[in-house]
From Swiss-Prot:
Ca(2+) 3 binds at D94, D96, D98, E105. GO terms for cellular component: myosin II complex. Gene3D superfamilies: EF-hand. Transmembrane segments: none annotated. Calmodulin mediates the control of a large number of enzymes, ion channels and other proteins by Ca(2+). Among the enzymes to be stimulated by the calmodulin-Ca(2+) complex are a number of protein kinases and phosphatases. InterPro entries: CALM/Myosin/TropC-like, EF-hand-dom_pair, EF_Hand_1_Ca_BS, EF_hand_dom. This is Calmodulin.
Amino acid sequence: MADQLTEEQIAEFKEAFSLFDKDGDGTITTKELGTVMRSLGQNPTEAELQDMINEVDADGDGTIDFPEFLTMMARKMKDTDSEEEIREAFRVFDKDGDGFISAAELRHVMTNLGEKLTDEEVDEMIREADIDGDGQVNYEEFVTMMTSK
C-alpha cells in the first residue's frame, strides 16, 4: 500500500513523523502521540492513544516506526478524508470560529506543533490555499487544499 506513494508524499510524511517523534529515536510512543494530539486541541485518553498505536503497530512493539506510519498514512489517504474529518481539521485552525483561517491562526497551530515558521513561510502557505485572494483561507479553499493531492 505504501508503495503507491510519491517521493514527495513520503518526504512530507517523514516531516510529519518527525513532528510526532519528539525525541528523534525513530519511533512514536503513546506519550508523543498524546503530546501532538493535545497541541491540536484534542484530548485523547491513554486507552484511545493505545488503540491508535495498536491499529498500525505491525510488529507489536507498542510504538509506531516510520514504515508503520507510512502504511497508516497511505490507508488514511485511500479512504480520503471524510467531510467530518476535514471540518474538524478546519475548526482546529479557525481558532476564533469566524469561518476563516488567518495567517496568525495558521502560525499559532504550527507553533503548537513545534514548527517554527517565518512570517514569509506562513504567508506563502496562506497564498497557496487562498483562491479568492482575500489573504485568508475559507472553508471551501481549505477543502480544495485538503482534497487536491
